[in-house]
Regions:
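N-terminal intrinsically disordered, cationic/polar leader segments
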Residues: 1-180
Length: 180
């Protein structure tokens, strides 16, 4: 038995094939536009993130020269308190205690790690591709260092810088959520 296709069925199948081709072309066009839009958005987000990275570098550069004076001021305050509280303690012991306090509040290491993380953010953004998860991790690391900087700081200036950093990190984190 052989199947017979009527002229109307044949016309319907041709029309259906034509519609399928149109749908496929529209889907491809929409997909191409989506990819192009995401690429443009990714470039803009990358630029925004890099601007904040540069602002954070500026903040680190502002904080670094303040460290020696902040530590010296802190040591002097601690020395005065210790002398007042324990006039009977020997001067060498006070210097040792002050050294311990100074190492607890020294934030140079945090500033160095911030710079390293900022370098990595810039490298990852420049690399392109699917970088969202990597950037999210780096935002966590930056936030951790900024928190440590704020908590260890004995200077209101350095604390204010750490707060500014945290705001920039939060802005970057919001943008990173939009990156694949």
């Amino acid at each position: 038995m052989q199947w017979q296709i009527s002229d109307s069925e044949r016309a319907y199948l041709r029309e259906l094939a034509k519609k399928q081709a149109e749908c496929a072309a529209l889907a491809k066009s929409a997909l191409d536009e989506l990819i192009a839009t995401r690429a443009r958005e990714g470039e803009k987000l990358g630029t925004m993130i890099l601007e904040r990275v540069e602002r954070m570098r500026t903040l680190v550069a502002e904080a670094a020269p303040k460290l020696p004076q902040a530590l010296a001021d802190y040591q002097e305050r601690m020395a005065t308190r210790l002398r007042e509280a324990a006039a009977s303690l020997d001067e060498e012991r006070i210097r040792q205690e002050m050294g311990l306090f100074a190492t607890r509040v020294d934030v140079a290491e945090e500033l160095n790690r911030l710079v390293a993380h900022l370098d990595e953010v810039a490298r990852v953004v420049g690399k392109g591709g699917a970088i969202g998860k990597r950037l999210d991790f780096l935002m966590q690391e930056l936030n951790r260092e900024a928190n440590t900087l704020a908590s260890k700081s004995v200077s209101t200036e350095i604390t204010a810088i750490a707060v500014d950093m945290k705001l920039l990190i939060e802005q970057m984190r919001e943008q990173v959520q939009n990156i694949e």
